[in-house]
Amino acid sequence: MSLKHKNEYRRSIDDYQTAAPVQRRIGLYWILATLRIVLTFAPQTGYIHPDEFFQSIEVVSGDHFDIDVYKPWEFNATFPIRSMFVPQVVVGLPYAILKRLSPYTFYFFGMSLRKPYFFVLFPRLFMCALSFLSDYFLYKICYMYGQNYRVRLVTYASSYVMLTYATRTLSNSIELVLTAALLYFVSRCMAYSEKVVLQNDYLSKKYSEAATAVERVKYYKLRALLPSHSLNDCFVLATITVIGIFNRPTFVAFAFVPIFFWLQRGMNSKSVGFRDFHIRMFVFVLCGLPAAIFFILVDSFYFGYLTMAEIGQLEIGINNFVVTPVNFLKYNADTKNLESHGLHPHFLHFLVNIPLLFNVLGVIGLLTVAKMIHSGLKAQWLHLPRLQSIVGLMTFTFIIPVVLLSVFPHQEPRFIIPVLFPLVFLYAPELSQVPSLDIVRRYVNDDGNSETYSPVEPTKHKSRKLMLWYISNLLLAFFYAFAHQGGVLPLVSHITTELKAKPHLTHVHLYTSYSYSLPTALLQLRNTRRIYRSSSNHKYKLTQDFHMYEQGSKPLPWVFDSIARRIKDCEENFVVNRIPYRLYYALPASAINEFTELSSNNSHLFRFHLVNTFYPHISIEKLPSLRSFGVLEHLLSFRDDGIFSSIVATAKDVYEYVEQFRLLLLKIEYLVPESKQNRLNK
């Protein structure tokens, strides 16, 4: 008996529906969901990228609290390239709640919420709640198409992207939720439209075949009773798209495929043609206008381009409005601007970022797409997903955004985290031993009867992939949640305590090396930009008493010389103006030996001692040297006193190596020259 292969993904929506909804136990998912919440409260001290603070918390906190903040260049009023509305919702709303709760918690419990922990926690709780919306959308899509939602929810929730990235105040995390929302509403419209179109085509056929006028009237009335479907959820989809574009203009890459699939629903039928396609496109644009106008007005008012006085006097022109996505495109169109952020090869997303973010799942996705391209080149069209199917939607939503974003030479892993959603839907069953409908292949016998065959890989092979998935995500979750630049936030908490405990007139100076920028909003520095009025109606401004010098990856000799000059200036200022000071230097433990050596060679300049240690702290910019890591040498060498000494030496090397993954805070003290010391003693 010969069998003709028929691709499972080319079936209609009715073929996916089960006779009765399958209820699956998802206890493991709830455990992972609880873990996501617990890690949000922990809190995660890992520092993924400066943008999680400097494009959200640092921008908004100054609008809600009387503190000094340093808004990044993206929010410069002269040429803003980021919209303010989304950060005001994601961070501003939690901060408004925090501000109102703080007096009550202090009154009833003696606990103030004006601490770095709560400044970080409240926005992250909001983001954590948003992240669960994407879980819900994944569940609904699986349920709608009769798919195994358990295996997908567990895979989705166990990804370190959801445990770390999704709960941070990154615009990319919001992009992930918006992409999931688009896919849900589009897939719902596709399922609904396919049913209506099939019924419409069936009734049209019966109408044309009707022998009598009575039958034609009957089928005509039945067609008229069919519900409308062409413009379903149009306003919702348009609004989500506009929000996504004003959040990150790169959202166009993620919205392109879902919106295209929504526009071309039913195009292979007799009742839907290009006229419907163009009508949908026109109405979609119209539905997006209210949201676009709203965002433009909000940004124009916030950045000072538009005022109520100008509106009252009708002095309004085109220059009174700012469109931040347009400014964003203008900025990124210039390669010279991207050079300051770092230029990368165009294949970085495919070769590095996808495996890094999605590990096993990403590799499976890339291999599957490669097979599809091979099938397309061989004109094996039945091996490709049907354009009208949910699998076609998810496949193109995975690959097209990555291709479009690869055009830009600046590529970071976080740029493509929204493709986790389609990846999980498509390939999560590959990691599980539980069969899923979307990996069933159907064959048609010579007599026309269909048979189903479920190719199940060997359990051992699948269990290896599943084990690799869990282990890699566990390690990466720990790395990004606690280890990567993990000493920065504890350092901020320490400096905040130091600023509150110091004498009133004392100035604090802080140098940092090989670490990300400290979010100054968390330090709650007193506002030096605001003009205050005294009780006698005198105007005054506060003096800046905290000074930060971020040295980045500058060579330590340069940093050493800068510290020497700074402490000399501070000492002279203390002698002349009687302004006391404290000077600190934060650097990775892997750099302390070099700094100590520089200090010993220039012992007449200053001295230092260790104040605090923050662990773990992994700085990719200054990893410990492997030359001091003599494990292999000790294991392969046999000493006179036996192998036990080699094991002890190896353990000591490992301990010393791990100990270098710390952030050290040094206090720098001025060293009075001997000649001056002698004069003082006399």
Give the residues covered by each predicted segment.
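Extracytosolic helix-loop segments that constitute the early lumenal/periplasmic catalytic or substrate-binding loops
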Residues: I37-A42, F53-I81, F85, V89-F106, ...
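Short acidic/glycine- and proline-prone juxtamembrane loop motifs at membrane-interface regions
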Residues: H49-D51, T167-I174, E412-P413
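Transmembrane-helix motifs of polytopic, lipid-linked glycan transferases
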Residues: I97, L121-N148, A181
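Hydrophobic/aromatic-rich transmembrane helices and adjacent perimembrane loops
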Residues: N172, A253, H346-L367, S389-T395, ...
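Perimembrane helix-loop-helix junctions
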Residues: Y184-T241, A253-A292, G376-W381, F425, ...
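Membrane-lumen/periplasm interface segments of specific transmembrane helices
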Residues: V242-G342, H346-F347, L351-L366, L405-F408, ...
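Membrane-embedded, lumen/periplasm-facing catalytic core of multi-pass transferases
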Residues: Q433-S590, H604-Y615, Q660
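Aromatic/acidic, Gly/Pro-rich catalytic loop(s) in extracytoplasmic/lumenal soluble domains
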Residues: S553-W558, S562-K682
